[in-house]
Amino acid sequence: MEVTDIGNKEEGKVWHRKPTPGKSVLASLVRTAQQGKVVRFLHVTFDTTGDCFLAGDHHGNIYLFDISRNRFRLVLKTGQACTALAFNLRRTTEFLVALADYSIRCFDKDTKQLVSWMRGHEGAVSSISVHSSGRYAITTSSDTAQLWDLDTFQRKRKLNIRQSVGIQKVFFLPLSNTILSCFSDDSIFAWECDTLFCKYQLPLPDSGPRISYKAFAVTLDGKSLASGGRSNLLHLWCLESRQLVRVIQMPSQVRTIRQLEFLPDSFDGGASQTLGVLSQDGMMRFINIHTCKLLFHIGSHDEAITAVAVNPSGRHIVAVMDNGRINIYSVQNLTQELNKPPPAQVAVVSGSEGVPDLPNLKMKVRSEVLPRPKRISGRRPQVKLLSLPAASSAEDKENELPAGLNKKRLVALLKAFGEYPAKYRMFVWRSLLCLPENHAAYSSLTDKGLHSAFLTLHEKYPIKSQKLQRALQRVLSALAHWAAIFGEVEYLPLVAFPFVKLFQNNAMLCFEVVATVIENWCQHWFEYFPNPPLNILSMVENVVAHHDKELLQHLVDCGITSQLYVWPLLETLFSEVLTRDEWLRLFDNIFSNHPSFLLMACAAYIICCREPLLHCSQRQDFEYFFHHRNNLDVGAMIKEAYRFMSSTPADLHPRTMLSDFTPLTSGQYPVFNKYPEFIVEYQSRERERIRLQEMEYLRERQQMSALRADFVRRRAEEEAFYAQQELLQKAEEQRKHVLEQEEEKLTQQRAKLAAMKRELKVKELQLLDATRRRFLKHQQELQASQIKKLDQEISRKMDLRDKETATAVQDLEIRQMELEVQRKRLEQRLLKEQQHVGHKVEEEVRIKMKEAEENLKEMLHGAETNMQALEESLAEVCRLDLESDWQREVVERLQKADAERERSRGGVEELQRQTGTEEQGLVNAMREEAHRKKDEAAAQIQESLQPRPSTHSDGQRLMGIHSAYAPPGFAHRHACSAGLKGESLTDRNKSASFKQAETNMVCLNSSSPPESTSTAFSFCRGRTQLDSGERELLKEIRELRQKLAARAKEGSSASSQTVCTPTPVSP
């Protein structure tokens, strides 16, 4: 085994000496860095051709190894270790690599350029699966699986799972549109790729231990699934029936299965029978899934394997070793011990017989794996060819082949070794089939181009290798141009494919081989077209009936006809049921014998498999049996075929019904017309009609596509227009929003300006209020000085009333203090309406006061000291109380809403009328009382008031204000304390009432009529009656005030829910 050290080279040779034939390991690759440290390789993957593979190490270097050209080169340096690799199946120069930073990148191996970068995983990507069309890819991590579009490199879908369930693997099934997802709870789901609709779920086994699936593998035809995990058991699923068909137990040394890989074969049609199982001990064991036999293994305990990649064609296996190396294995060398012929037998040939009696040579073949024989000597066993007796010259001439070979000698060699040498097999076949090699005739056929029947061959028979696909199309097209029937035969690709694969480098030889096979070994196949050749099937059935009646009876009892157990073998020429080497060995014997040998081989295959066939009873089992490989010794089958050739009676022997071998004519190929021409012509016409319909359909579809493209374009334009309109609308809304914000800011600025104006007005009102208070204080001081002068003058003249006057003054001072406190408390609420109401009311009151003073000064000359002081105090208190009431009520009314003002206007007017009525009644009562007392004490007071007319005028004014207006004002104020609107109107009415009451005011101690302006009084007459009358009047006024206050409280409690409507107070 040659070890190639890559080192720091960017390109070089994979091996420097040609690998030794027979060695299983072609080369071992290692990369050493500085100081002899080995840089470990982590992952490998093959391309679609199978000739090249990528390998990534843990330094982030990715190398491309070309086995066919014996070259390697450094593709790129990523700088970080890769976790998964995969080729892009559509663009073969591109590949995907998952890196340790959880990203997936696409590179071009030729240009070494980054094509795209995909992100979205939050964990390390463990696997990359690419769809067979190359358009989609699935990347899998422990928590999510994501579906990518490789045309746009955009993520289409994402598979999320619960935290309790992890994802093991998600991958595409080959040659289908199905996604298979496997989870950590052993559940397996199948999904439709386009719609992600769940197609089915594989049922979990009801019995047996839980395997905990970790590894999965699918055959190339997508029909079988193998799964394994933490156990030595393998589960084989049939994806068509969705059932667990087999459980295989590996040897006891296997405890955990790390990786599973099917080994492809050229002639199995994708239904691989060999499965490689990589276990925890680092060995990969290859087994036959049908016979459950161990075929061979790679790796050992010393050189353990960590990962494996299998060539798509099944020729090579690349293994990543535990020590960081890469080993390249040859599958052909690994399986040559299985496929080599049995040891040479010593046969005694009598001189009378031309050939040895091969059916009498019996061998015991073991189905188990044979250990590789130890070499005893360096020479192979010598086989001595016995000379045959001389024959006639005519017979020798008949057996002479074009290449100078002798057919009898070739047959003898074949019977001795069982097969022709692989190196010379194609040469021997060309000689046996006497191929004419008509280059001109073949060129005339190929010049006609591809036949219309095989334009869509890749859809029905997809082949990974495009080269092989094109070769098959060319050969089939040439056959269809040679004979029209071959364009209608559906199974012709199955017949031609094995030969196309063998002669893919020489299409003409392949065509002539297939044509020779059809001309000789497919005789009478097309007489019942399009039905199978019933006459040929009957021949095989008669042979089986002659040699094994029990088996034929079993087939008849199960309802199985020859179309089911003979025709599958013939239409595929055994390529489905035999391996490549077995098929080549069989056709070595078929081409060396009469064309009837093929039918005898079918009968021999059926009879050699009699044991498993006798155990089958279902039609599906028989169909599966004759379409898949089985455990069969081909050597024994060939011997049985020879025995049937010699022991079958002449009346049953196919030789009598089939012509002898006839090679193709030289120069031009023979005419092939052994088929019902009318059927072929009818089918040709139908095919042409269908082709025309398809062309019409394609034309209409193209038109529809154009219309659809135009519709899509118009719809895109409309969407763009609406999107633009939407953007414009959004911009307009944004501009409106900006304008609204600006307006809101302007409104806020205006509100701030209004607040500043209100503050200035409030300050102005405060200044005016302070000025007014100073003026009132000055006026009070003047009045106090006047009162003081009056008190001193009266005290000198009225010694007897000192004590009573002092007591009255004290009471009035206490009351004045209380009223002053109340006035100050209420003045604070009436700041906003002082400039509108205060000045006007004050001016009117001042004018009226002056008029009253002037009139009273002329009419009155004096008054009694205690009565005058009481009247002045009461008048002052009343005036201050009225001003404070007006101010407070104005403030309260301004704070009410305008809507409440309109709703309560009627109630206010009613309250005004009632208040006016009460005030008028009270004024009338007081006026009557005043007239009555005036008449009684007129004579006594007249003399006492003469010296002080001005003093009496002040007392009369204050007394008149207090008696005529104070009680109604208090009642009205308490009755409307709930804050009714329209109070300003009430205030104006009160002011008018006050003026009227003041105009109609009559002094209580005046004996003259109201029109009189001057009257003389005396302080000496009727003092006792005046005192008692004054006390009674004050008592009545207090009682009336108490009643009005109680009624106002009741009205205020009711006004909290409804409009206050107080009842008039009776005088």
Swiss-Prot record:
An annotated GO BP: cilium assembly
Pfam families membership: RabGAP-TBC (PF00566), WD40 (PF00400)
Region (Disordered): 896-955, 1045-1067
Coiled-coil segments on the chain, per record: 724-773
GO terms for cellular component: centriolar satellite; centrosome; ciliary basal body; cytoplasm
Entries under PROSITE patterns matching the protein: TBC_RABGAP, WD_REPEATS_1, WD_REPEATS_2, WD_REPEATS_REGION
Residue spans of biased composition, Basic and acidic residues class: 896-912, 926-937
Entry-linked Gene3D superfamilies: Ypt/Rab-GAP domain of gyp1p, domain 3, YVTN repeat-like/Quinoprotein amine dehydrogenase
Location within or outside the cell: Cytoplasm, Cytoskeleton, Microtubule organizing center, Centrosome; Cytoplasm, Cytoskeleton, Microtubule organizing center, Centrosome, Centriolar satellite; Cytoplasm, Cytoskeleton, Cilium basal body
GO MF terms, alphabetically ordered: molecular adaptor activity
Bias (Polar residues) ranges: 941-953, 1052-1067
SMART domains linked to this entry: WD40
Intervals holding WD repeats: 36-75, 76-119, 120-161, 162-201, 202-249, 250-288
Keyword set, alphabetical order: Cell projection, Cilium biogenesis/degradation, Coiled coil, Cytoplasm, Cytoskeleton, Repeat, WD repeat
Main location: cytoplasm
Domain Rab-GAP TBC positions: 419-594
Effects seen without this gene: Morpholino knockdown of the protein causes a delay in embryonic development and evident embryonic morphological abnormalities, resulting in a significant body shape alteration associated to microcephaly, microphthalmia, pigmentation defects and pericardial edema. A significant reduction in cilia length is observed.
Record's function text: Molecular adapter which is involved in cilium biogenesis. Part of a functional complex including OFD1 a centriolar protein involved in cilium assembly. Could regulate the cAMP-dependent phosphorylation of OFD1, and its subsequent ubiquitination by PJA2 which ultimately leads to its proteasomal degradation.
Name of the protein in its database record: TBC1 domain family member 31
Gene name as annotated: tbc1d31
